Curated annotation (Swiss-Prot):
It is a multi-pass membrane protein. The chain crosses the membrane at residues 19-39, 67-87, 118-138, 155-175, 181-201, 230-250, 265-285, 307-327, 355-375, 384-404, 415-435, 437-457. This is Probable potassium transport system protein Kup 2. HAMAP family: Kup. Coiled coil: none annotated. It comes from Syntrophobacter fumaroxidans (strain DSM 10017 / MPOB). Keywords: Cell inner membrane, Cell membrane, Ion transport, Membrane, Potassium, Potassium transport, Symport, Transmembrane, Transmembrane helix, Transport. Belongs to the HAK/KUP transporter (TC 2.A.72) family. Transport of potassium into the cell. Likely operates as a K(+):H(+) symporter. Pfam families: K_trans, K_trans_C. One of its GO terms (molecular function) is symporter activity.
Length: 640
């Protein structure tokens, strides 16, 4: 099998497009509806939480200037410098995201010790787990904060906020099965309207108080901490809400490319957000009574209802982007061996990567609705929001450090100062958010702990199971010698034996041969492996070895953004001379019955968890799209 390329050079066509070409412009337009939904709707609650939240600061002119200075420099240093300038350079063949970053640090290359790579893999797993917590909170807080605009219009609408939010969220999750390809085409134009609108609203107030622009001076931020000390640090946990969703610039890079995302961020999203934030600051300088909801305070009263509608649509787009991101993350986790098999439905024939996972969708729906019903106000959820994002950003910085030192070969003299700069901001925000643990932050940490424990247990359990199976395998040369010596009867057709490892003879074949004493004319040993690249071209997917006597070994390589498909594999194999008749082909699968009494080093409760996850995992037949009427399952009892 060909060795996979670990270089940091992208094979993605979008990345190399010129910054100001028509293609880049169109991709930048499309990215507005996917990448910026979360960070683009942060003005709905970010400034409000600083002056009217659980950990609010006194509303006075020095504090307004200090908070706006922190907002400006947070967005500049974390989003513009860290992500746009540096992290987005670490693409894996055009793809971004925390698993793509992990794949750039291959453990089998000699660049990093196995023990250290295990620590790095744990960090990536923890980062991914935190994103699941984010995926639960984002739809709830975004839609709830938008619908709360009705309270500004009339106090009579207050009892309707929670029911309307639940209706919107319920509809959002129920339409996921239909895919987002069609409605996704209008997301970009809607977000253009959103950004232009919030920019205009903010600019209108800045004209009244242009002195608010002086807040770009970092001196105001230092004076803010000097004056407020501990309370100022706590408020930093609310300021960080202005950069939540910033990690999507990197995570969604594979869909649009580096230059289109940079263009859309610097050309529209970033300026529009700054204008709105500074406009809210100008409003509070003029009328402190709007501290309870400064975003809607910018809106003329006659336009409140249309603005609530636009805000709700924008938050639905933000929620959709997060839900799609969780689906994609789950697909990657399954392929990389961190998650049990689940039913993955591809919702678009034209666009790779648009997937729907029913189990994940309904778990998210139940969790989101539960949060809305329990907390009832977006301010209550704000405490749970920032801790996941800041922890994930810190873990991204650490993984990026390993990429630039182990893969790109940067010297420590260059890499360490950059890491220190990134972690200074990341850990400052994370530390400030620790004060929110009892105000809702525990929700995110609990979700992350459950997901991370499950992922690591599944990874370790599958490794222990693979070792157990391999230890009982017969070398292929001994098996083939036995077949040649006994010359068993051969029946017409093809038998395909799925194999965990591309070495030795699968236990399912040994059992079949032992009990039936017969073989098919053509026997294929099929192994599916995951690579450290997002996708594998069809021409490189298969590695075929003729073992003789009608036996063939096929090793199919799939990227971590792809879902293996047996019919596709057999079609590609036929193009290389391995011809099979679907009506005369049988698929033999080993079905393990797992016990916890084995000698593996896993703790007993983790063994029990792994056995439970295995029993509830999706079947290979459904996951690999194997024709169910051609499947033969052979039972095998294994103690781990």
């Amino acid at each position: 099998m060909e060795k996979q390329n670990h270089s940091n050079e992208s094979s993605d066509g979008h990345k190399s497009s010129p910054l100001f070409s028509s293609t880049t412009f169109l991709l930048a337009l499309g990215s507005l509806g996917v990448v910026y939904g979360d960070i683009g709707t942060s003005p709905l609650y970010s400034i409000r939480e600083c002056f009217h939240g659980t950990h609010a600061i006194a509303l006075n002119e020095p504090n307004i200037f200090g908070v706006l200075s922190l907002v400006f420099w947070s967005m500049t240093m974390v989003i513009c410098v860290k992500y746009v300038v540096f992290v987005m350079r670490a693409d894996n063949h055009g793809m971004g995201g925390i698993f793509a970053l992990l794949a750039l640090i291959p453990g089998d290359s000699g660049r990093i010790s196995p023990r250290l790579h295990g620590v790095v893999a744990f960090a990536a797993t923890l980062g991914a787990s935190l994103l699941y917590g984010d995926g639960v909170i984002t739809p709830a807080i975004s839609v709830l904060s938008a619908v709360e605009g009705l309270e500004v219009a009339t106090e009579a609408a207050k009892p309707l906020v929670v029911p309307l939010t639940c209706v919107v969220l319920l509809a959002l999750f129920l339409v996921q099965r239909r895919g987002t390809g069609v409605i996704g085409n209008v997301f970009g134009p809607i977000m253009i309207v959103w950004f232009v609108t919030i920019a205009a609203l903010g600019a209108g107030k800045i004209v009244d108080r242009p002195d608010i622009l002086l807040a770009v001076n970092p001196v105001y931020a230092f004076e803010f901490f000097a004056a407020n000390r501990f309370v100022g640090v706590v408020v930093l946990g609310s300021v960080v809400l202005c950069i939540t969703g910033g990690e999507a610039l990197y995570a969604d890079m594979g869909h649009f490319g580096r230059n289109p995302i940079r263009l859309s961020w610097l050309g529209l999203a970033f300026p529009a957000l700054l204008l709105n934030y500074f406009g809210q600051g100008a409003l509070l300088l003029s009328d402190p009574n709007f501290a309870f909801n400064p975003f809607y305070g910018l809106v003329p009263r006659t336009l409140l209802y249309p603005m609530v509608c636009l805000s709700t649509i924008a938050t639905v787009i933000a929620s959709q982007a997060m839900i799609s991101g969780v689906f994609s993350l789950t697909q990657q986790a399954i392929q990389l061996g961190f998650c049990p098999r689940m039913r993955i439905i591809h919702t678009s024939r034209e666009t790779r990567g648009q997937v729907y996972i029913p189990e994940v969708n309904y778990l998210l729906m139940i969790a989101c609705l539960g949060l809305v019903l329990v907390f009832k106000k977006s301010s209550g959820l704000a405490g749970a929001y920032g801790i996941a994002v800041t922890a994930d950003m810190a873990l991204t910085s650490i993984l990026f450090f390993f990429v630039i030192t182990r893969t790109w070969k940067w010297s420590l003299a260059r890499a360490v100062p950059l890491l220190v700069l990134f972690l200074f901001f990341d850990l400052s925000y994370f530390g400030a958010n620790l004060f929110k643990i009892f105000d809702g932050g525990w929700i995110t940490l609990t979700i992350a702990a459950i997901v991370a424990t499950s992922m690591i247990t599944w990874k370790d359990g599958r490794a222990a199971l693979a070792r157990k199976i391999l230890s009982s395998r017969l070398p292929e040369n001994l098996f083939l010698e036995d077949v040649a010596r006994h010359n068993p009867p051969r029946v017409p057709g093809t038998a395909i034996f799925m194999s965990v490892s591309p070495m030795g003879i699968p236990v399912s074949l040994l059992h079949h041969y032992k009990h039936n004493q017969v073989l098919h004319e053509q026997v294929i040993l099929l192994s599916i492996t995951s690579t450290d690249t997002p996708t594998v071209p069809d021409r490189k997917k298969l590695h075929i070895v003729d073992l003789g006597q009608g036996f063939y070994r096929i090793i199919a390589s799939y990227g971590f953004m792809e879902t293996p498909n047996i019919p596709t594999i057999m079609r590609l194999a036929s193009m290389q001379g391995i011809v099979t008749d679907p009506a005369r082909t049988s698929y033999y699968l080993g079905r393990e019955s797992l016990l916890t009494g084995g000698d593996s080093k896993m703790m007993q409760w983790r063994k029990a968890l792994f056995v439970y996850m295995s029993r509830n995992a999706g079947t290979p037949t459904a996951y690999f799209d194997i024709p169910p009427d051609r499947v033969v399952e052979l039972g095998l009892q294994i103690a781990i």
